[in-house]
Amino acid sequence: MASSSSNRSFLHRNANTFLTYPHCPENPEIISQKLWDLVARWNPLYIVCAREAHRDGNMHLHALLQTDKPVRTTDARIFDIEGFHPNIQSAKSVNKVRDYILKEPLAVFERGTFIPRKSCFQGNTPPFPKKNPNKDEIMAHIISHATSKQEYLCLVRKEFPYDWATKLQYFEYSANKLFPDIQEEFISPHPPSSPDLLCNESIKDWLQPNIYQPADEGSRKQSLYIVGPTRTGKSTWARSLGLHNYWQNNVDWSSYNEDAIYNIVDDIPFKYCPCWKQLVGCQKEFVVNPKYGKKKKVQMKSKPTIILANSDEDWMKEMTPGQLEYFEANCMIYVMSPGEKWYSPPQLPPTEEV
């Protein structure tokens, strides 16, 4: 998994730490012993570390580390070992994380006793610093000492039962900000297989600078527009390129992943695509309004969008001259030829002569 964006300050505070070391062939036991020593001051209680194989044959490691006291650090390199840098996340559900780590291991190492957290965690939360704290001081204490989303909401419910009952959505919002959900490792929904995926030479020229290379400082990527018949494999091809945000039917910003390399807008009519200029223009740091959510700033770096449309929903036919001018200036336009496919036909077995 990709690490957090460098544009955001790093803060990790949790008694349950989930680590992923991509492209790491190290022995799980060696990694576990070094991690155990790294968190000695927080009193480690349990660790499980497993080595798995990517579909491309490369190895990666997952580890769940549980400590008596929450690990508190602003050092994004604290868990670096032998030159390997992990993705660091707070384990929202230690039971699910442990099951995820142990699903298909090639090698496993465990130390200590696993601590399942099925209900509100009581733990060793320190007492309030003063005898009669006010509401703000209690809330600050909860924010400072909660180690998970579940514990945070449990403490709020205990200290402010009326506010919890009437303003739960606001507490859930702050809990999600303090303890983001775990981003599972991306696995392409369309891995290389038979029949092989393919694309036009002109699109190959677009791929290199816009998907496979980082943008130069101050520059912007270029988007790609593909229009053509249905059932030609264009969606399968577009989704095979790497980690992406995928939207079909509507654009839902609530699940937007900043670590994605590119966006895909698939079969959404032009009039129903909000922020189309920002997406097509690969703009940075624009504000969106997710449904049932608060406005937020997204796309901290220039990111291309692949727009896929069938011939009957051709965006260019719906645009004003001014919109079309912007579209053509910021997007490579590819109109499919009759009979064109995005995959090679499967090879038929040779027929025997009679």
From Swiss-Prot:
Motif (RCR-2): 60-62
Chain ranges for the short sequence motif RCR-3 as given in the UniProt record: 100-103
InterPro entries reported in the protein's UniProt record: CRESS_DNA_REP, Gemini_AL1_MSV, Gemini_AL1_REP, Gemini_AL1_REP_central, P-loop_NTPase
Record-annotated active site: 100 (for dna cleavage activity)
Keywords carried by this UniProt record: ATP-binding, Covalent protein-DNA linkage, DNA replication, DNA-binding, Endonuclease, Helicase, Host nucleus, Hydrolase, Metal-binding, Multifunctional enzyme, Nuclease, Nucleotide-binding, Nucleotidyltransferase, Repressor, Transferase
Biological processes, Gene Ontology terms: DNA replication
Residues engaged in binding a divalent metal cation: 52, 60, 62, 104
Protein name: Replication-associated protein
Organism: Maize streak virus genotype E (isolate Pat)
GO CC list: host cell nucleus
Entry's localization field: Host nucleus
